[in-house]
């Protein structure tokens, strides 16, 4: 019976600690930008040796960025900041 009490207390402590998150930690989790690299048309023909200079943006490119891939997808575009 003592073993069961120890296990229950330990589980309650784990639950309490995991439930106590500071509000600023929750905000940081949401605002983290997740970027994925993509290959622009002028990066080269071979995917293995090309440097990926583009960034995948969901929907369409952000303001001030240009679409750098000729292929079309409904969900995302391959974009980068204009050169020059």
Curated annotation (Swiss-Prot):
Cellular localisation: Secreted; Nematocyst
Q: Which residues form the signal peptide?
A: 1-19
What keywords does the record list, in alphabetical order?
Answer: Cleavage on pair of basic residues, Disulfide bond, Ion channel impairing toxin, Nematocyst, Neurotoxin, Secreted, Signal, Toxin, Voltage-gated sodium channel impairing toxin
Any GO CC annotation of this UniProt entry: nematocyst
Cysteines engaged in disulfide bonds, as pairs: 38-78, 40-68, 61-79
Q: Where, if anywhere, are coiled coils annotated? A: none
Propeptide positions: the record gives: 20-33
Report whether Disulfide bond shows up as a keyword of the record.
Answer: yes
Entries under Pfam families matching the protein: Toxin_4
Molecular functions per Gene Ontology: sodium channel regulator activity; toxin activity
Please name the SUPFAM superfamilies in this protein's record. Defensin-like
Task: Extract the InterPro entries matched here.
Answer: Myo_ane_neurotoxin_sf
**Chief location:** secreted
General function of this protein: Binds specifically to the voltage-gated sodium channel (Nav) and delays its inactivation.
Q: Which family does it belong to?
A: Belongs to the sea anemone sodium channel inhibitory toxin family. Type II subfamily.
What's the name of the protein? Delta-thalatoxin-Cad1a
Instruction: Give the originating organism.
Output: Cryptodendrum adhaesivum
* Taxon lineage: Eukaryota, Metazoa, Cnidaria, Anthozoa, Hexacorallia
């Amino acid at each position: 019976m003592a073993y069961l009490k120890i296990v229950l207390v330990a589980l309650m402590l784990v639950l309490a600690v995991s439930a106590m998150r500071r509000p600023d930690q929750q905000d940081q989790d949401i605002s983290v930008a997740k970027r994925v690299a993509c290959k622009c048309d002028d990066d080269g023909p071979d995917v293995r040796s090309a440097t990926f200079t583009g960034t995948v943006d969901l929907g369409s490119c952000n303001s001030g960025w240009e679409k750098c891939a000729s292929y079309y997808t409904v969900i995302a575009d391959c974009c980068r900041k204009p050169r020059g």
